[in-house]
């Protein structure tokens, strides 16, 4: 497979797009509260992206997707379509996935929110484990290792926490296209011999379930739910492989303050 190696000029553009994408997730947080609809959250994000940031919402009309963001609640694994009929309630766990296009370059990220700040013990642990699963993947990235080392590490951690890794959806290359090579699986499998090299840009975005790994696509052709109706959680970052590890291009200030990952990860 032909995996693009980004030039310094491209990297500058990607950093800009990624910062804008991460800013949307920070901006929307105060609005994620009981009584608000996912349709309203999407409109706030959409207007902020278009009017304030002057960027293009990448999800809107992508293969026919009707909204600017994906918003997935509780047992929805991914690709939840925002709707004025979906009202948030305290205890819901919510993923908001935002991708922006700035000057032809894509920035892609997502994070979890807990409505009201509290949920049941199992779902709280799930959300925490989803973030740590992403971080485990990020800490694995360095040049000259096999791509599938990422999935191996993510799967090992996730299953150690008594959760399961969704198989049907994966991380992906991203740059001047929304999705390109490589496919970044979050479980251990054949990777075709791909070796990570500096300048490769991709997302890591494990979706993990409180119950079994199996999922189903709903009648709208987009919304993916767990088959057993257990809750699901996901965090996503976009990163670039460096000479000594990776740069997390969509990192948020809150994460830097926590200290579990940094913008520049030295993993060698």
From Swiss-Prot:
Ligand binding (substrate): 79, 179
Binding-site list for a divalent metal cation 2: 108, 172, 205, 236
EC number(s) given by UniProt: 3.4.11.18
Family annotation (SUPFAM superfamilies): Creatinase/aminopeptidase
Catalysed conversion reaction: Release of N-terminal amino acids, preferentially methionine, from peptides and arylamides
PROSITE patterns: MAP_1 (PS00680)
Textual note on the cofactor: Binds 2 divalent metal cations per subunit. Has a high-affinity and a low affinity metal-binding site. The true nature of the physiological cofactor is under debate. The enzyme is active with cobalt, zinc, manganese or divalent iron ions. Most likely, methionine aminopeptidases function as mononuclear Fe(2+)-metalloproteases under physiological conditions, and the catalytically relevant metal-binding site has been assigned to the histidine-containing high-affinity site.
Any GO BP annotation: proteolysis
Binding of a divalent metal cation 1, residues: 97, 108, 236
Cofactor(s), by name: Co(2+); Zn(2+); Mn(2+); Fe(2+)
CDD domains: MetAP1
Assembly notes: Monomer.
Stated family: Belongs to the peptidase M24A family. Methionine aminopeptidase type 1 subfamily.
Record function comment: Removes the N-terminal methionine from nascent proteins. The N-terminal methionine is often cleaved when the second residue in the primary sequence is small and uncharged (Met-Ala-, Cys, Gly, Pro, Ser, Thr, or Val). Requires deformylation of the N(alpha)-formylated initiator methionine before it can be hydrolyzed.
Name assigned to this protein: Methionine aminopeptidase
Organism name: Haemophilus influenzae (strain ATCC 51907 / DSM 11121 / KW20 / Rd)
Lineage: Bacteria, Pseudomonadati, Pseudomonadota, Gammaproteobacteria, Pasteurellales
């Amino acid at each position: 497979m032909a995996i693009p190696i980004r030039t310094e000029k491209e990297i500058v553009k990607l950093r800009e797009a990624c910062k804008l994408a991460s800013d949307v997730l920070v901006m929307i947080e105060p609005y994620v509260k009981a009584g608000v609809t996912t349709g309203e959250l999407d409109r706030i994000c959409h207007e902020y992206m278009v009017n304030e940031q002057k960027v293009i919402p990448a999800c809107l009309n992508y293969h026919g997707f009707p909204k600017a963001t994906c918003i997935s609640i509780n047992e929805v694994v991914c690709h939840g379509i925002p709707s004025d009929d979906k009202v948030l309630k305290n205890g819901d766990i919510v993923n908001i996935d935002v991708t922006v296009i700035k000057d032809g370059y894509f920035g892609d990220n997502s994070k979890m929110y807990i409505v009201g700040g509290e949920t049941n013990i199992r779902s709280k642990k799930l959300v925490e484990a989803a973030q740590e699963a992403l971080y485990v993947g990020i800490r694995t990235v360095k040049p000259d290792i096999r791509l599938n080392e990422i999935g191996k590490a993510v799967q090992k951690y996730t299953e150690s926490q008594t959760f399961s890794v969704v198989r049907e959806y994966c991380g992906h290359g991203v740059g001047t296209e929304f999705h390109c090579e490589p496919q970044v699986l979050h479980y251990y499998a054949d990777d075709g011999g791909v070796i990570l090299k500096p300048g490769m840009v991709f997302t890591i975005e494990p979706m993990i379930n409180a119950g079994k790994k199996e999922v189903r696509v709903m009648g709208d052709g987009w919304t993916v739910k767990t088959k057993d109706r257990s809750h699901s959680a996901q965090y996503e970052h976009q990163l670039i492989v460096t000479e000594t590890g990776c740069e997390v291009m969509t990192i948020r200030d809150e994460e830097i303050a926590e200290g579990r990952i940094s913008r520049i990860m030295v993993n060698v």
